[in-house]
């Protein structure tokens, strides 16, 4: 069996996803217990306990989720549709959250209020390879001292332009979200592993100072570990956090089971218009407190690090031992009940 480096995966002939690869532990691990593996990191000047950011979707990150993730040492990006945003920006307090998403047409007065609260800004668009995104980023960075996240991209060719515009971090992934139908509807997109590696290598080769957010396609703590091992600074989660107590919306009881709504940002439920739809809407099982999900991610990530002999995330990002899985090899690892 061939053991692949990042560079070899990057030049692989096919587009790869998380399910196509696996990490290979080749060293004798010196980690006695997974508790020795540290998942803390620094993202755009913020200290995180776990490298997790919530997606600014209206069914994932409202004010309650943003505050709780902040308390847990993660980042929740308050979605731009949230009804509490105006009162939050006009209040004297407004603390407890770290980031807010905006649209391309968000006015400078609103942005100024966001900056005064010392929040990060996420320009929430489906495609950052767009001159309007570059123009908005440049406008914000020239006028304000604030960290700006842009997205999304699937290839690294535009990193130079994004850096010139002042972007501090970029969301990587087009069409890979669980309720996103962009790739099907438009024919656009690359497997997340291939996207991450392409952008990671271009960033390093050209010494571009933009942080990488792996956004989409992550279904498990193992996928989080893979994303970090592939060079991501943090991961952005939607589906994994959906259905938790802190997500917006009511808990619904149906057939004796508790559920909550989960939908894509370009779904009909969000747009409420009969225009081109690139997202789905569904119900997910109620999961209880988001703390349980974050704890599970932290435990799984630490366990992966202990296998890989990595005491911290910087060491995990230096991973150069990967396997490409056949379909049968992937199916073999699934539980058989």
Language model segments and positions:
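Active-site entrance/lid segments in N-terminal catalytic domains of soluble metabolic enzymes
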Residues: 1-211, 241-244
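Alpha/beta catalytic cores of nucleotide-metabolism and tRNA/nucleoside-modifying enzymes
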Residues: 1-29, 165, 187-214, 218-337
